[in-house]
Amino acid sequence: MKILIEGYNKSIHKRDNQILIMEKEGELEKINIKKIDDITIIGKGSITFDALRLISENNVRLMSIDYFGKINYTLEYPSNENIFLRKQQYKTSENHKGLIIAREMIMSKMINQKSTIKTLNKNKKLENVKIFERNINEAIKQIGSLRFGERTDIEKSKMKMMGIEGSASVDYWLAVNELLPKEIGFFSRNNRHPNDITNASLNYAYAILASEVNKALVINGLDSYCGFLHFDRQKRTSLTFDLMEEFRQQLVDKVVFSLVNTKQISNDDLDKRNNSISLDVRKLIIGRVLDKVNSNINYEGENLSYAQIIDKQAKKIVNYLINGEKYTGFSLRW
């Protein structure tokens, strides 16, 4: 079970073997710790030492996200398992094998980008959007043609891939600009200081996705701070951002674009003083993203939820690192 605690003045307590969620003096919910897989906190509140201990001892992942989509902190139970896996991960992140998995992740992202704008343009049939789509298709071919070996310059190759990915993303967001209603005021992607509801909603929803991806990586014994594509930075969960690339369009972009196109969200839902999203819309976004995460599709011959697919992709990373099995990214043609 995933617990998501949103809003102000909420607190987390321990009562026997239960987690108790309270607001001011009132009890909102109590859940047996054995039923909880992870807890995501979005907002301001407090948690008792006893609750922290109970959460940690039962290996429940705890993550805090601010209203702008930034991960504040995570809590994980200390483990000395999977040392060999971690060593392989660190080694691979610094050689050509890491580039191979990064290439697959980028290619999957671009396939999903192409599929998303193709779906959005199905009825509109805008010619300039078709040009952007063709540009992304060329970028997919460029990425797919890259080959890496033991003598490959890691930094240069990574920069080249990110350059191709960056160009494809420019085309993707230009296409999105053409496809969304003009009155919504979306002109370009802004992940730092969004002043429109579309960008703010994307940032917020990506944070929810980050929580899901981070959970899958940790469960499978991987170090979320050691990535293959994104450069390692202090306090940045690089591998989380790597794997997120495969799921951004299907789990976040399509959800937010649908809310915009059906006028369920507008710029009136954005507080212009600090560019934060209203409480009702935050709850709406959380609900829609989690509904999508828990929805099922047919993937590689199995009927799986997106949450299960994220876990499956994390396991593919493990099998690539330990057994040398080929890694294939997640993408859909629609």
Swiss-Prot record:
Signal peptide segment: none
Cofactor: Mg(2+); Mn(2+)
Keywords of this entry: Antiviral defense, DNA-binding, Endonuclease, Hydrolase, Magnesium, Manganese, Metal-binding, Nuclease
Gene3D superfamilies: CRISPR-associated endonuclease Cas1, C-terminal domain, CRISPR-associated endonuclease Cas1, N-terminal domain
GO process annotations (BP): defense response to virus; maintenance of CRISPR repeat elements
Record family assignment: Belongs to the CRISPR-associated endonuclease Cas1 family.
PANTHER family, A to Z: CRISPR-ASSOCIATED ENDONUCLEASE CAS1 1
HAMAP family referenced in this protein's UniProt entry, alphabetically: Cas1
Protein name: CRISPR-associated protein Cas1 3
Source organism (scientific name): Methanobrevibacter ruminantium (strain ATCC 35063 / DSM 1093 / JCM 13430 / OCM 146 / M1)
